[in-house]
Structures are given as structure tokens and as C-alpha cells.
Amino acid sequence: MNAFVMHAFRTRRLDVWYGGEAWRPLVHVRDCAYAHIQCIESEPSTVRGKTFNVVQDNYQILDLAQRVKATLGLMDINVEIDVNRDHVDRRSYRTSGDLMKRQLGYSAAVTPEAAVHEIADALRTGVFTNFDHPAYYNLPWMKLLLDIEDRISKTGPIV
């Protein structure tokens, strides 16, 4: 979502590939932090041995693009959506946060619209400026971390 909004903010367009039909679960990092706190503060017997998914909801990519466009539009940032339907994205997946809600009474609350507004505000105020830094993109960031890990294993730690 971060890169999606950053691209829309930067170029005033959103490229939606594969028709945007693929599903993605979304959660804001703040909701993840609260979920971790909830688990830490819970009775150990309530969380021991359990795997909890933290998800606000599941969305199709095209729906997210439309939500980004609408939210940015309310901020006087007009964005066009270009949908490419040439291929099918096989990486479609959904998940459920029902176990966490049942066991701990916790549900993620930050909506995509709230997240878009937060990210756009940060971009407008210059909090983020180097849009091409690998930290903003999952695959380049993971590659960079692996490269650094490899380098440190060969040279040893600095301190």
C-alpha cells in the first residue's frame, strides 16, 4: 500500500496490473503493533501455540486503486487509474483475523482510506523524499538485506 500511494502521489497515476482482480489482506503497521501488545498482555494460555493473523480486511487490487484515487481526490490530488488486463495474477490470497477477534477480542481498525491519508500527508510534508530507496519496496529491500547479511558474514561485524 505504501508504494502504491507513493506512486500515485508522485506520478498522479496508478497502474493496475492483471485486471486488479487479485486479493490482498491489508493491515496497518500500527494495528500490527497493537496486536503484538494484545498478545503480550494476554494470559499465556490464551495465546500459547496459536497463530494469529492480523488483518483489517481483504481487498482486490482494483478496489484498492479506486479507494486510493478517491481518498487522494479529497485531498485535491487527482489520480488516473490505468487497468492492464493482459495477464492473470496468480498471487491472489485472503486471510482471516477471526481467531484473534474470538480469542483476544482484537480487530485491526485502520482502514485503507485512513492509511492513504496518513501516507499522503507524510509525502506532502516531506517526511519521505527518496522515493526510489529500496526500503519502500519489498523485493529490493529483502535483496539489500540479504546482500548486507552476506557481506557481514564475510567481513565480520564492525563493532
Task: Identify the meaning behind each predicted range.
Residues 1-16, 26-27, 35:
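Oxidoreductase cofactor-interface core, primarily capturing Rossmann-like NAD(P)-dependent enzymes
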Residues 17-159:
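C-terminal substrate-binding subdomain of Rossmann-fold SDR/epimerase-dehydratase oxidoreductases
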